């Protein structure tokens, strides 16, 4: 066994109704004034006010910033940072899905150390602890509440930049399954399959370890056996709890094992065409699972049995059975059949032709190759391979 290292330096509270623990945790943090960074949907539903009221119950003031889009931009980080500094807040509550989490982490860096989030792009460029941060996810999910990454879109170059630093890990996380029951079916599907892919890519990564494998296996089992139920009925609290716990385990797993070609390739798709992150991942997954099948050394069977209603045994299993099972799962939960459909579903300017998409394949592949995840994909990949995979996904 190769040497591996792990550290999980967070305080994580998990349980139905655990949002009520926010005042206690905020007091433990020592905060007096919060900026709640969330999204417009949660604000409309009254959940942002509910969080603010919890803080007010222990005399903690709360301001809010909810002007956050999917695939949040450098400009959004600038606006949220200005709000934080103007408000006089001394800690941040990230309340929502991956977009508010990414923005909150970036604000925590820029508010403390100045400059632009682009100054911290890459690995280990954050000089020290950031503004204290409490993360409360409302999707299952990105796992962002337990990861050391913030992904922000830089529209000036159609690029999703990543800030990677253990300094941006939230100090506290609250996982309340009741909060994810309000998600529309499409959001539940996209976020749920994203969480599954976190576990799947971490599991087959060349950087996987016994520690990450144990978490990834449990995550895939929880998500794979419950995602259909949860998308069908978000009020199924048992399925919601399984999805949220699975997302948590997947987030920790890929923090150590990293990801692979799916995430490396999906970020450019979102940057160029504004496709939701989970949807971009999902339409790429079967294509890349087929590509990686040559490098499988037994793990595909485990993944298959986590998502297929009909179990298989080693003597009858073929890796292509997993590819078919992935396609079946994606169809069942309403994921678009291919990248062309996903891009057109996301388009705000009319039909995007296959020729237009083809013209972006080379620059997308160039950007995908910049991702560190390519290096740990189980099958080696050159730029020409990435271009080929994009074309197969169309």
Protein language model annotation of sequence segments:
Residues 310-394:
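C-terminal charged capping/lid subdomain of soluble metabolic enzymes
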Residues 43-115, 229-240:
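N-terminal small/polar loop signature for handling phosphorylated ligands or for N-terminal nucleophile
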Residues 19-22, 44-47, 74-75, 99-105, ...:
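Short glycine/serine/threonine-rich phosphate/pyrophosphate-binding segments
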Residues 202-328:
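Active-site segments that bind and position negatively charged phosphate/pyrophosphate groups
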Residues 112-208, 299-302, 306:
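A glycine/threonine-rich phosphate-anchoring loop and its flanking beta-alpha core
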Residues 20-35, 54-58, 86:
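Glycine-rich phosphate/diphosphate-binding loops that line cofactor/substrate pockets in enzymes
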Residues 1-29:
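N-terminal amphipathic/basic leader segments beginning at the initiator methionine
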């Amino acid at each position: 066994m190769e040497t591996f290292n792990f550290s999980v330096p967070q305080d994580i509270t998990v349980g139905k109704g655990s949002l009520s623990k926010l005042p206690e945790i905020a007091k433990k943090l020592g905060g007096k004034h919060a900026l709640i960074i969330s999204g417009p949907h949660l604000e409309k539903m009254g959940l942002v006010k509910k969080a603010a009221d919890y803080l007010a119950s222990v005399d903690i003031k709360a301001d809010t910033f909810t002007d956050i889009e999917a695939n949040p931009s450098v400009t959004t980080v600038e606006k949220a940072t200005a709000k934080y500094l103007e408000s006089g807040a001394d800690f941040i509550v990230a309340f929502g899905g991956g977009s508010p989490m990414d923005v909150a982490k970036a604000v925590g860096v820029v508010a403390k150390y100045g400059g632009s989030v682009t100054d911290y792009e890459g690995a280990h460029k954050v000089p020290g602890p950031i503004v204290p941060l409490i993360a409360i996810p409302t999707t299952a999910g990105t796992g962002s509440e337990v990861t050391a990454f913030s992904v922000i879109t830089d529209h000036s170059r159609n690029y999703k930049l990543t800030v990677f630093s253990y300094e941006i890990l939230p100090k506290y996380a609250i996982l309340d399954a009741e909060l994810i029951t309000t998600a529309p079916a499409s959001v539940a599907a996209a976020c749920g399959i994203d969480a599954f892919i976190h576990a799947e890519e971490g599991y087959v990564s060349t950087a996987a370890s016994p520690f990450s494998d144990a978490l990834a296996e449990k995550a895939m089992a929880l998500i794979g056996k419950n995602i259909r139920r949860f998308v069908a009925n978000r009020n199924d609290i048992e399925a919601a709890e399984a999805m949220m716990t699975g997302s948590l385990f997947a987030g920790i797993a890929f923090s150590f094992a990293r990801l692979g070609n799916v995430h490396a390739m999906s970020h450019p798709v979102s940057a160029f065409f504004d496709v939701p992150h989970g949807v971009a991942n999902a339409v790429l997954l079967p294509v890349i699972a087929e590509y990686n099948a040559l490098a499988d050394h037994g793990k595909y069977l485990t993944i298959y049995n986590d998502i297929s209603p009909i179990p298989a045994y080693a003597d009858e299993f073929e890796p292509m059975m997993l590819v078919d099972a992935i396609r079946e799962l994606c169809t069942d939960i309403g994921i678009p059949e291919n990248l062309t459909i996903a891009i057109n579903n996301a388009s705000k300017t009319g039909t995007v032709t296959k020729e237009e998409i083809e013209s972006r394949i080379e620059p997308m592949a160039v950007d995908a190759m910049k991702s560190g995840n390519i290096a740990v994909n189980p099958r080696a990949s050159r730029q020409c391979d990435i271009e080929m995979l994009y074309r197969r996904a169309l």
